[in-house]
């Protein structure tokens, strides 16, 4: 995933 990208959102962290």
Curated annotation (Swiss-Prot):
UniProt keyword list: Secreted
Expressed in which tissues: Expressed by the venom gland.
GO cellular component: extracellular region
Subcellular location: Secreted
Domain of life, source organism: Eukaryota
Main location class: secreted
Keyword Secreted in record: yes
Miscellaneous note of the record: The primary structure of this cryptide Pep-26 is identical to that of cryptide Pep-26 from Tityus serrulatus (AC P69940).
Protein name: Cryptide Pep-26
Annotated source species: Tityus obscurus (Amazonian scorpion)
Lineage of the organism: Eukaryota, Metazoa, Ecdysozoa, Arthropoda, Chelicerata
